[in-house]
Regions:
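N-terminal amphipathic/basic leader segments beginning at the initiator methionine
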Residues: 1-40
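Acidic, glycine-rich active-site loops and adjacent beta-strand->loop/helix elements
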Residues: 10-11, 77-83, 109-113, 137-142, ...
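Short acidic, glycine/serine/threonine-rich loops at helix termini
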Residues: 16-17, 85-87, 118-119, 144-150, ...
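Conserved catalytic cysteine-centered active-site region
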Residues: 32-36, 40-53, 79-132
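Phosphate/pyrophosphate-binding loops at sites that engage ATP/ADP/AMP, CoA/4′-phosphopantetheine
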Residues: 58-72
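Flexible, glycine-rich active-site loops centered on histidine and acidic residues
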Residues: 126-160
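Channel- or pocket-lining gating/hinge segments that regulate access to a cavity or pore
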Residues: 162-169
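Single conserved hydrophobic/aromatic residue that forms the stacking wall/gate
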Residues: 196-200, 204-207
């Protein structure tokens, strides 16, 4: 019995910042952005879009009428939540017209949240061979002007349909988790911009 990603699609806003122009404005070598982080453009979300609209746009083209009946869980992974209580998955579930007997949750852990979302979907589907799970990663990342994280900003969403007998990617059972409380990146409550601390890389010690 195999479980994995059966369909995948993405959505990015039409607006962007040219990374070479940003480098010139910041007085740095363009290759620092173009080759160093491999970016030529940085997506910018207009005020009319957020993680809900981007997530729904990413998912709508991979959902058939049969899929809408088969999806029994919607998970949105994001660090750009628009509500402290209500999951954005609930709104996306409604916009996509997915059948009502579905679980809808939101997961958060910086840029890692989509990984445990996929793992949760896999575990959930092991007991449900005829059902599907829609996993969406959607974010609007913002850093301060001229900050170290400025060139890594962006906006967009990826939607993945997980099911049995996947056509794109089969998930393995092996995984090794590791957690350490490090303030390299965080956004406290009330802050509009993310904070970043860049230090020399360290190798975690084994216990």
């Amino acid at each position: 019995m195999t479980i994995g990603i059966d369909q995948i699609n993405f959505y990015i806003p039409q607006f962007y910042v040219d990374m070479a122009e940003l480098a010139e404005a910041r007085g740095v070598d363009p290759n620092k952005f173009l080759k160093g982080i491999g970016q030529t453009e940085m997506a910018v979300s207009p005020v009319s879009q957020d993680i809900v609209s981007m997530g729904a746009n990413a998912a709508k083209d991979i959902l058939s009428d049969d899929d809408k009946k088969a999806v029994s869980m919607v998970i949105v992974a994001t660090e750009s939540a628009i509500d402290s209580a209500k999951a954005s998955a609930v709104q996306i579930h409604n916009l996509l017209g997915i059948q009502p007997f579905a679980r809808c949750i939101e997961m958060k852990e910086a840029c890692y949240a989509a990984t445990p979302a996929i793992q949760l979907a896999k575990d959930y589907l092991q007991q449900r061979p005829d059902e599907k799970v829609l996993v969406i990663a959607s974010d609007t990342a913002r850093y301060g002007l001229e900050s170290g994280g400025e060139p890594t900003q962006g906006a967009g969403a990826v939607a993945m349909m997980l099911s049995h007998n996947p056509r794109i990617l089969e998930l393995n059972d092996d995984a090794v988790p590791f957690t350490e409380d490090v303030y390299d990146f965080w956004r406290p409550t009330g802050h509009m911009l993310s904070l970043i601390h860049i230090s020399e890389p360290t190798r975690p010690e084994r216990i």
